[in-house]
């Protein structure tokens, strides 16, 4: 089967990019590809059979119909206007046309210098490409909207970061790479007609049902806000910290995008800061909902030329509603509640307080809770707490709450185990795969990808265990 590519972005938004070709790496080689995703997209297996070089995966060749561009956008970084940014090391190769008429961006990260590289070198390193591939696939299998990873190419090209590393490329796929920062770029250049063109493009291709509706722009922004609210709720319930929620890292489609200094909670710490460059804690775990709202407010400002203020404010309210509604639903599912009762939030907050005092493992606590039996006054979870008197008091209230549901243990446990993962991508697991890959051993990278495809399956190995102490202290930064 021949892959078909289109160039809608290039054809319809000429002011938003620079056309250019990728710059290949030295001695590039394909070290991993996503066989399951490739099969779903009907990508011929022969494309991955590269023995001399890295082919399209390393930017050495293009497929018919590809028209590479680097996109320009701007943004607020750590709450401060940063001006023009753009694809400093990534190139949108083309948009794959799928059978249902939708498209999928093929974006090559680490593809070399672009006009938007600023002081950078246009490269990604093996460490960061491995982390992003693992994180995006982990999030997908957790059911959280995200970009996807299709392939990783390693090389012998030296790249200087905190230390000297080697260059790599990641083929990232997404329904769209449209960001809040695209709109900010033209708003602050005082080109509101181009801001409106971006909105028209989004509506035409992603919300076509609103094209002929008079209030289409207001409806569109409401949906952007709602999707963002649901995304942040998913992050908070699974314990995911993005680490660098700049406006240029926010997706119009409500996708998790730009994995850098991310982390999943190990010990439950609501003030967890994943990014060691975030000295003020702006992007700490418990601040993500308010930062997302702040970012939406920045986006709303760019839309004032063609959306009424009242409509923008209604959309921002929609964010809060979507966030709280989705978060509440997810947390009730994690606790095994099928109905909503007035004391549920208090019960959850009591558990969080107990976990924070004890440094309980976030993922393992909820997974162990999912094995609770109503009639049993004891729980294996009890042994993980030092203050067992406090746990016993909470657990008795929890069991009493379970008894108000007309649901048997088997059904409740089944529901809980579908939303409480046994495995998340802990930083130490990613680092173990990276360390091996940097020595030329890709086995752990492939094995970890397989494990992350089944996050809701109980395991008795170290993929589902608490991290070693050194694993809790790993520092990650924007170069990650």
Curated annotation (Swiss-Prot):
Documented EC number(s) = 2.7.7.-, 2.7.7.108
Q: Which of this chain's residues are annotated to bind ATP?
A: 86, 88-89, 109, 121-122, 172, 179, 258
- Required cofactor names: Mg(2+); Mn(2+)
Chain positions recorded as Mg(2+) binding sites = 249, 258
Q: Which domain of life is it from?
A: Bacteria
- Could you list this entry's UniProt keywords, alphabetically sorted: ATP-binding, Magnesium, Manganese, Metal-binding, Nucleotide-binding, Nucleotidyltransferase, Transferase
Recall the GO molecular function terms of this protein's record. Answer: AMPylase activity; ATP binding; magnesium ion binding
Q: Which Pfam families match?
A: SelO (PF02696)
Q: Does the keyword Transferase apply?
A: yes
Q: Where is the active site?
A: 248
The UniProt catalytic activity note for this protein reads:
L-seryl-[protein] + ATP = 3-O-(5'-adenylyl)-L-seryl-[protein] + diphosphate; L-threonyl-[protein] + ATP = 3-O-(5'-adenylyl)-L-threonyl-[protein] + diphosphate; L-tyrosyl-[protein] + ATP = O-(5'-adenylyl)-L-tyrosyl-[protein] + diphosphate; L-histidyl-[protein] + UTP = N(tele)-(5'-uridylyl)-L-histidyl-[protein] + diphosphate
Describe its function: Nucleotidyltransferase involved in the post-translational modification of proteins. It can catalyze the addition of adenosine monophosphate (AMP) or uridine monophosphate (UMP) to a protein, resulting in modifications known as AMPylation and UMPylation.
Instruction: State the family named in the UniProt similarity comment for this chain.
Output: Belongs to the SELO family.
Record-given protein name: Protein nucleotidyltransferase YdiU
């Amino acid at each position: 089967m021949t892959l078909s590519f289109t160039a809608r972005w290039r054809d319809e938004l000429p002011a938003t990019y620079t056309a250019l070709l990728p710059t290949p790496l030295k001695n590039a080689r394909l070290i991993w590809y996503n066989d399951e995703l490739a099969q779903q997209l009907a990508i011929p297996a022969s494309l991955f059979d590269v023995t001399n070089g890295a082919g399209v995966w390393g930017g050495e060749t293009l497929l018919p119909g590809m028209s590479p561009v680097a996109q320009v956008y701007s943004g607020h970084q750590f709450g401060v206007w940063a001006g023009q940014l753009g694809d400093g090391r990534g190139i949108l190769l083309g948009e794959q046309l799928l059978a249902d008429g939708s498209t999928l961006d093929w974006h090559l990260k680490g593809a070399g210098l672009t006009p938007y590289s600023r002081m950078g070198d246009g490269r990604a390193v093996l460490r960061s490409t491995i982390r992003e591939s693992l994180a995006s696939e982990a999030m997908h299998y957790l059911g959280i909207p995200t970009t996807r990873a299709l392939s990783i190419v390693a090389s012998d090209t030296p790249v200087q970061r905190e230390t000297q590393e080697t260059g790599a490329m990641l083929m990232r796929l997404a329904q769209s790479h449209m960001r809040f920062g695209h709109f900010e770029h033209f708003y602050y250049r005082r080109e509101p007609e181009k801001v409106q063109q971006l909105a028209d493009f989004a509506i035409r291709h992603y919300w076509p049902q609103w094209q002929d509706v008079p209030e289409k722009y207001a409806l569109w922004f409401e949906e952007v806000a709602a999707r963002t609210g649901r995304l942040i709720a998913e992050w908070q319930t699974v314990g995911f910290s993005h680490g660098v929620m700049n406006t240029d890292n926010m997706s119009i489609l409500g996708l998790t995008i730009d994995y850098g200094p991310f982390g999943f909670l190990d010990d439950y710490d609501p003030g967890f800061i994943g990014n060691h460059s975030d000295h003020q804690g702006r992007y700490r775990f418990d601040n993500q909902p308010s930062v997302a709202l702040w970012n939406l407010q920045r986006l709303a400002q760019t839309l004032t030329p063609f959306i009424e203020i009242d409509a923008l404010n209604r959309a921002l309210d929609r964010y809060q509603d979507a966030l709280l509604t989705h978060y509440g639903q997810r947390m009730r599912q994690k606790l095994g509640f099928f109905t909503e009762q007035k004391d549920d939030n208090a019960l959850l907050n009591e558990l969080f307080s107990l976990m924070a005092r004890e440094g309980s493992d976030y993922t393992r606590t909820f997974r162990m809770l999912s094995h609770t039996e109503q009639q049993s006054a004891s729980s294996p979870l009890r042994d993980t707490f030092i203050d067992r008197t406090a746990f016993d008091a909470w657990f008795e209230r929890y069991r009493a709450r379970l008894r108000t549901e007309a649901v048997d243990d088997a059904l409740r446990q089944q529901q809980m185990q579908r939303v409480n993962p046994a495995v998340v991508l802990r930083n130490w697991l990613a680092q173990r795969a990276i360390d091996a890959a940097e020595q030329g051993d890709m086995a752990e990278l492939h094995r970890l990808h397989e494990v992350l495809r089944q996050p809701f399956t109980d395991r008795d190995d170290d993929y589902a265990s608490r991290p070693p102490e050194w694993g809790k202290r790993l520092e990650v930064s924007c170069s990650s």
